[in-house]
Amino acid sequence: MKATSPSRIVLSLALLTVLTGCAFAPEPTVDRSAPAQWTQQPTDRTDRAGEPTPGAKLTVADLQTWWSRWNDAELNALVDQALAQNLDLAQALGRLKQQRLLMGVANAAYQPEVSGGIRTLQDVAAVDSYFHASIDVAWDLGLFGAREASQRTAHAELLNVQASVRAASVALVADVVHRYLDIRMAQYQYGLFAERVALDERTVQLLKVRREQRLDTTEAVHQATLQLTQSRAQFIALKESQTRAAHALAVLLGRSQPDPKWLADGNVQRPSQHPALDLQVLPADLLRTRPDIQTAEAAVERAAGALGLSRSALYPRFALSGSLLFSYNLTQNRRTTADHMPLVGPVIDIPLFDWGRRRSQADADEAALDVAIMGYRQSVLEGIADVETALAGLSAQRKRLDLLQSTQTLIAERDAVLARRQQLGLASEFSRLSEQRAALQNRSEMAVAQGAQALAYVALYKALGGAPLPAELQAAEPPAEGRQP
């Protein structure tokens, strides 16, 4: 028998390597392009000359503690409690732990498997009984990209779970700040509404006196009474909104009941305004801060892994198999020697009769990869649009607040003139009531505008993917953007 030459062995190995490399799925190319700068800029502070004033810089690192810019110790404590006690975030972290444990068995299918077994049996003639003990070895080599595709699929699942943890953290912090601001704004509005109700009650009293003196009509009294009723109805709606926000905040903190002070009718001071921003976060930074983009990236990785597996299935599957059997004749009380020889050999699975089905599956997985790539680009565009929309809303609320401030100045000047006329006996208390109510109404609208501006900041930070990075994600190695075959 002629021995195989070393050159033939090298040639065979080279051919096997080439075939293995050809089976790899191509590296997916995703469109990561983004504008160099934002179209909108949060220049929401101006000096006396009307020029925008520089704000505090906001970098990517600052997104992890964005709520602290309100300088509110109570808000900071609530966010810390939510991050430690929220059940949705805890579930997401639990799924992350589960997926990391599963990562340890991602390559198990392509590692040598050793198994053993014992059994008793009879021969065909039912004359002798045997005791068999065997050791079996099987090793799927995972050629033609099967091993790498399986690793990629497992990595995609981990990336997806990490993105879900990030999404839960972003949504949690934004919701906590949102509900807290709702409560504080409702408590501040409570004081303004109380003043308005008192002013409307005084208006009704004075109109009744003027009606008795035939200086006004019954219709005027009815109109003032209707206005008083509407103010009281708004009072009730405000209380309902405060209660709803308090219970929602309690759920976010993992509590069954809200803190009593969240439901108090306190005439608290107006919540502090958010400082001006100098946004240093670029559109390209969204690729690593927004959870939905990370989820879309995981979908691309998962689709690429599935394509790699389906393409590897188009090629023969090679595995090594071996078995060692120990046989003992129980009837004759002696060891048999006919079956004790070890068996070692390859197992080859060649796709012949089902090759068409496998080809169709590979084509379908390739189409699924194209869809995932388009979905990734869509998520990038949506992320950029969300930030631009939040910036536009922030600018609009700033302009609205400036107009209301100018209106408040005019109302205050008018009221000062009427107050002076009243001191001189040239005007009555009744003549000032309309101006006082207009001032209260404008103050209430200013409070609403400031609340809307604060919520616009919350929307901006949420669109930027701002949230603290959980310790479980900080300890993880940054995921690779892709593997080259």
Residue ranges and their predicted role:
Residues 147, 163-282, 393, 397, ...:
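Periplasmic alpha-helical coiled-coil/stalk elements that build and connect Gram-negative outer-membrane
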Residues 55-70, 80, 117-138, 150, ...:
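Small/polar, glycine/serine/threonine/aspartate-rich low-complexity segments that form flexible
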Residues 81-90, 100-112, 136-152, 163-170, ...:
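A glycine-/polar-enriched beta->alpha junction
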